[in-house]
Amino acid sequence: MVEDTASVAALYRSYLTPLGIDINIVGTGRDAIESLNHRIPDLILLDLRLPDMTGMDVLHAVKKSHPDVPIIFMTAHGSIDTAVEAMRHGSQDFLIKPCEADRLRVTVNNAIRKATKLKNEADNPGNQNYQGFIGSSQTMQQVYRTIDSAASSKASIFITGESGTGKEVCAEAIHAASKRGDKPFIAINCAAIPKDLIESELFGHVKGAFTGAANDRQGAAELADGGTLFLDELCEMDLDLQTKLLRFIQTGTFQKVGSSKMKSVDVRFVCATNRDPWKEVQEGRFREDLYYRLYVIPLHLPPLRERGEDVIEIAYSLLGYMSHEEGKNFVRFSQEVIDRFNSYEWPGNVRQLQNVLRNIVVLNNGKEITLDMLPPPLNQPLDRPSVSKLIEPKAMTVSEIMPLWMTEKMAIEQAIEACDGNIPRAAGYLDVSPSTIYRKLQAWNGKEERQKV
């Protein structure tokens, strides 16, 4: 890692620690070039602005002597033009600082995996860390398998899931595992761009196309040529622009705003929404023909409340680098906090968990996260269903006595129903871990199948 700011280098080291890689940090371009005489790295993370030379100078020197070493640029002074220039001169990717942990891990993990030809995480989706994701639950292993299966295809992928579940991380994982992984990944958030600017953001514009268009500008479609175009929150796109997008998908050609010339590109489409896309079609907010064009391989990201013990795995990973970043000493959670995390519904999903832990780490001190440190609403008592609603006591005859496992099964099923199908929440009320319920349900299903035979 070539980074002249020690605190930033330490932060990014903590982000990458879960990947289990050896990181050597230098502060100048000259030291970076000199270090190659002693050891050839699998990857170089390179700051664009250094005290003795530019990142572009370092890139040229490295590529001259070691052309196969992948380089990823990092800069707080990024622009689209700089990104394009860096990619043109051999940079594998381009990250804008401050860089989020998930984005950095996905990019670095993929670059190293491709450079060394080792596909440990892709070949073993049961690992706790997979392409930037954290978690080994059954629901996430199905996501990993879908990514592995779909990555090599050019077919469009439609990612659905609640806000905060990691849809952009998923899109980057698909791109990273694909044959286009060394080509650009360009993301555009359809909900964050004003209606009158989104066409220009997507297709670009020529000088004088509208007030303020002082120069020609490339759009996301052109920048993604050869790679992946990620359309986030696609269902927010205006119907008129959906028509132009459909034509672009069908033909691979588009016109810049203000231009009559057609441009042709080769991109792989990945899109995402936190809505039900078919419901949007039925209610007239999303074109049906566009839906069928894009909804080729559906991929649903489960909400955090359905990921069982992943909650605690993610929490520990976040706690590690947040404590390091903030200069704190937190290393563990109390059992009460673990139980509360497992029982909470997490309506904001992983993003909410990140914010909760950031709040705790910044405002408190110690080695253990305790219940009194939790911010609202996690510090409020759980709204437990009435026991009388779960099990109605009644007298029974000898003929009505059931095996103990069936009685336990009935109690657990009623608790799950009372919690609207939320197994982790039901587990919290029953004072057992979610994995215990999953294991029992699997065993009971096997017993019932044998009884049928």
From Swiss-Prot:
Keywords: ATP-binding, DNA-binding, Nucleotide-binding, Phosphoprotein, Repressor, Transcription, Transcription regulation, Two-component regulatory system. The keyword ATP-binding applies. One of its GO terms (molecular function) is ATP hydrolysis activity. InterPro entries: AAA+_ATPase, CheY-like_superfamily, Homeodomain-like_sf, HTH_Fis, P-loop_NTPase, QS_regulatory_LuxO, Sig_transdc_resp-reg_receiver, Sigma_54_int. The modification 4-aspartylphosphate is found at residue 47. Gene3D superfamilies: 1.10.8.60, 3.40.50.2300, Homeodomain-like, P-loop containing nucleotide triphosphate hydrolases. Residues 133-362 form the Sigma-54 factor interaction domain. One of its GO terms (biological process) is phosphorelay signal transduction system. Residues 1-112 form the Response regulatory domain. ATP binds at residues 161-168, 224-233. Pfam families: HTH_8, Response_reg, Sigma54_activat. CDD domains: AAA, REC_NtrC1-like. The keyword Ligase does not apply. Involved in the regulation of different processes depending on the cell density. Acts together with sigma-54 to repress, perhaps indirectly, some genes. This is Regulatory protein LuxO. It comes from Vibrio parahaemolyticus serotype O3:K6 (strain RIMD 2210633). The gene is luxO.
